[in-house]
């Protein structure tokens, strides 16, 4: 009997796969297919003439990896608003508005972490300390504990590294901001641009424990530490409460090729092949035309999506968006002597 049932399941899965049209990830046909479905979002071209290998490398997060213990939260008495945007809640913290660019490197796991950490340092010091935490330092110096550098990594281990070893400051490529700015250049994965072309190739830079010339303090003195790191349960309310009380979090989800075409609205997967796991920064929530969403910052520059941001369906663990949330609290005692 079970063999008959297994055969039936296989046939149904095959029929479902055949009923879904197959499109090139960046094709006009895929854009038109999504938009004709009249779903909750609009598709358009964000990439032009790039290798599929590059697109898959952008999704550099290993899903289902190790997780730190969950933090117990008591949110029953907390009144959460219908909509929340960390950019508006903490306008004095400039990093919350910032969109970075990971370039030709699967470093999203590091970017989601350092972006949220930067935000939280500002929030938890009442805007007395505003710093761009270095994605370069995390990407290059965490080593095998975090994964495989530009070939992918584990968001939870990124936060653990922050608490154990600390992270120095470092801004965007060629910004000369902080101790270790990002060394991988942005590439032209977008339409009608002037940057060099993107490829799926690119080695992880070397770990350097020296700040760039002209910057002080020293590498060791520039370290920023976390007090703790933890997982957040996949409860919609717990994630909202965490953001509301402590600031943006890092999340991760499964990316399908239709997501690459996101322009506006609330993303829900329509069709397309699986590209990989992708880490991002969740900074708020709301409801658009009756559809609940998470407000999310990507790391594919500002000419992707909605000025670098996107919205994705909230409350249904869509593409796993609520299953991989991690966060932490900064060690604020290291700052009070300097303030």
Curated annotation (Swiss-Prot):
EC nos: 3.4.22.1
Propeptide: 18-79, 334-339
Class of enzymatic activity (EC top level): hydrolase
Glycosylation sites: 192
Cellular component annotations (GO), alphabetically ordered: apical plasma membrane; external side of plasma membrane; extracellular space; lysosome; melanosome; peptidase inhibitor complex; perinuclear region of cytoplasm
Cystine pairs: 93-122, 105-150, 141-207, 142-146, 179-211, 187-198
Assembly with partners or alone: Dimer of a heavy chain and a light chain cross-linked by a disulfide bond. Interacts with SRPX2. Directly interacts with SHKBP1.
Family indicated by similarity: Belongs to the peptidase C1 family.
Protein name: Cathepsin B
